[in-house]
């Protein structure tokens, strides 16, 4: 059994969720499987083990779970990137494009110091709109975005390619065809 197949087997697919035609890739089953979760975190961390990473930034909400584990393994701090209005202290904010509209995300203004080496983490990359916004937000406050890591890539939707075009190396552990 290959690494990709082994981890893929721990991801549940839910057809027609949240709307018809979508194949929702549910990582909660991977998170519930201790061996699969550990393996996924180890594989996301592996390229940067032994390198200086100051912070791991995780996008709401599953990026918090994965990002916290990655930060722990790298002995780095963790920074949540949240939807507008969810953080209690002074924030820096950016608007970003969604498939059908615009939203805003923010982080604490003092969460990252200029020049700090940051890895962006989330569970899945699809169109890349949210991840692109997060990279722009991190760079806006002076972060050196070393890489973006995702468990799942939906390559047909072009998100990983969008980040690579921004000179952000992308690490994914598996791909699924379609939406």
Curated annotation (Swiss-Prot):
Highest taxon of the lineage:
Bacteria
Q: Which GO terms describe its cellular component?
A: cytoplasm
Recorded catalytic activity of this chain's protein: AMP + diphosphate = 5-phospho-alpha-D-ribose 1-diphosphate + adenine
Major place of residence = cytoplasm
GO biological process terms, semicolon-separated: adenine salvage; AMP salvage; purine ribonucleoside salvage
Might you give the EC number(s) for this enzyme? 2.4.2.7
Among InterPro entries, the record links this protein to: Ade_phspho_trans, PRibTrfase_dom, PRTase-like, UPRTase/APRTase
Q: Does the keyword Glycosyltransferase apply?
A: yes
Q: Where in the cell is it found?
A: Cytoplasm
- Pathway where this protein functions: Purine metabolism; AMP biosynthesis via salvage pathway; AMP from adenine: step 1/1
Which molecular function terms from Gene Ontology are attached? adenine binding; adenine phosphoribosyltransferase activity; AMP binding
Task of the protein = Catalyzes a salvage reaction resulting in the formation of AMP, that is energically less costly than de novo synthesis.
Among PANTHER family, the record links this protein to: ADENINE PHOSPHORIBOSYLTRANSFERASE
Q: What family does the Swiss-Prot or TrEMBL record give for this protein?
A: Belongs to the purine/pyrimidine phosphoribosyltransferase family.
Record's subunit section: Homodimer.
Q: What's the protein name?
A: Adenine phosphoribosyltransferase
Organism of origin is Bradyrhizobium diazoefficiens (strain JCM 10833 / BCRC 13528 / IAM 13628 / NBRC 14792 / USDA 110)
């Amino acid at each position: 059994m290959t690494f990709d197949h082994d981890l893929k087997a721990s991801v549940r697919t839910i057809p027609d969720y949240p709307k018809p035609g979508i194949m929702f890739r549910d990582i909660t089953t991977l998170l519930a499987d201790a061996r699969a979760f550990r393996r996924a975190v180890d594989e996301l961390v592996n390229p940067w083990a032994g390198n200086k990473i100051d912070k791991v930034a995780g996008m709401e909400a599953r990026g918090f779970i994965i990002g916290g584990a990655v930060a722990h393994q790298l002995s780095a701090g963790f920074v949540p990137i949240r939807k507008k209005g969810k953080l209690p202290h002074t924030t820096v904010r950016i608007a970003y494009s969604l498939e059908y509209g615009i939203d805003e995300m923010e982080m604490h203004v003092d969460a990252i110091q200029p020049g700090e080496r940051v890895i962006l983490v989330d569970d899945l990359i699809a169109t890349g709109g949210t991840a692109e916004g997060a990279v722009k937000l991190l760079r806006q406050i002076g972060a050196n975005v070393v890489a973006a890591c995702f468990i799942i890539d939906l390559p047909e939707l072009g998100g990983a390619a969008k980040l690579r075009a921004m000179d952000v190396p992308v690490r994914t552990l598996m791909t699924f065809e379609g939406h």
